[in-house]
């Protein structure tokens, strides 16, 4: 049975090809261990965030280079729907190569736009946008963890 048979044609058609591909074949799913980070001369950052509204949760792993604060690698584990997996996967990809201060500027809109097939067509149906918000929130949590500050202080910056 195909995913289309399970989800139903009309709803399934509201997802971009990129979202469908990332649901089925996420590129950055996994974890970074302490020894992996050490090989990159990086600090390991692990942050968790959950969306109580739907029961989805994501754990984000960053390997942050000690001297430059550049995110050398990013991985995630996600518990939830396919949209949460796709959003988490794209979010991890967007973080790689950025400094922590640059990564915290990634918004849920950036994540959603990166999943689009066409610039003017949303990647997911409106009722699934909260998944990209969860990706945004876990980036803020990882940044706060790395900097040793309360997440609320990042909203004030």
Where do the language-model regions lie?
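C-terminal binding/interaction regions
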Residues: 1-28, 34, 38, 46-47, ...
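Structured beta-strand/loop patches that form or line metal/cofactor-binding pockets in enzymes
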Residues: 25-71
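Active-site- and interface-proximal helix/loop "cap" or "latch" segments in soluble metabolic
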Residues: 52-54, 63-132
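Low-complexity, compositionally biased segments
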Residues: 59, 68, 91-92, 140, ...
